[in-house]
Amino acid sequence: MKSFQKSYEFDYPWEKVTTANWMKYPNKISTHVIAVDVLRRELKEHGDVLLTERLITIRQNTPHWMSILVGNTNLAYVREVSTVDRRDRSLTMRSCNMTFPHILKCYETVRYVPHPKNPSNVTLFKQDAKFLSGVPTKTFSEKVENWGVKRFSDNAVKGKVGFDSILAMFNDIWKNANE
């Protein structure tokens, strides 16, 4: 099993980051995400918790050696379940790939919370992903997991840049609304 962790600070209040999160994809930078469909959304805990289940469609090429295992497909699907908790001001998203889980399973958790030192203006982002290959041979299994981490890392960079652009766009809207 391989893992990937990343954390950032966004110079926006948690409420704004959480709002912008729903518009994060698709964007011009993260072109691998081609669709995000809401499957279910409901309020829990007397309206304090918003539960959302989404299907994320991704299109990207796989290396030739991987096509031996998965065929010539370039589409993948990810199930994401998120909770927004107004009481503790947290957004937690958990996702897992639905495509080819017998070859590579990716479990991701993302969490947005107010920064403890500046909770009114800064939001902490923490991302943790685990990669587990189901390929029976150790050498090939490690190659699959390493490829998964590398691809995920590359996409995470694009995701951060893309989300920064979404936040900047929303910031302009928020500023204009307050004028």
Swiss-Prot record:
Pfam families: PRELI. The keyword Membrane applies. GO terms for biological process: mitochondrion organization; phospholipid transport. It is a peripheral membrane protein. The keyword Cell membrane does not apply. It is found in: Mitochondrion inner membrane; Mitochondrion intermembrane space. PROSITE patterns: PRELI_MSF1. InterPro entries: PRELI/MSF1_dom, Slowmo/Ups. Keywords: Membrane, Mitochondrion, Mitochondrion inner membrane. GO terms for molecular function: phosphatidic acid transfer activity. Residues 1-175 form the PRELI/MSF1 domain. It comes from the Eukaryota. One of its GO terms (cellular component) is mitochondrial intermembrane space. Required for mitochondrial morphology. With UPS1 and UPS2, controls phospholipid metabolism in the mitochondrial intermembrane space. Interacts with MDM35. Belongs to the slowmo family. Present with 672 molecules/cell in log phase SD medium. This is Protein UPS3, mitochondrial.
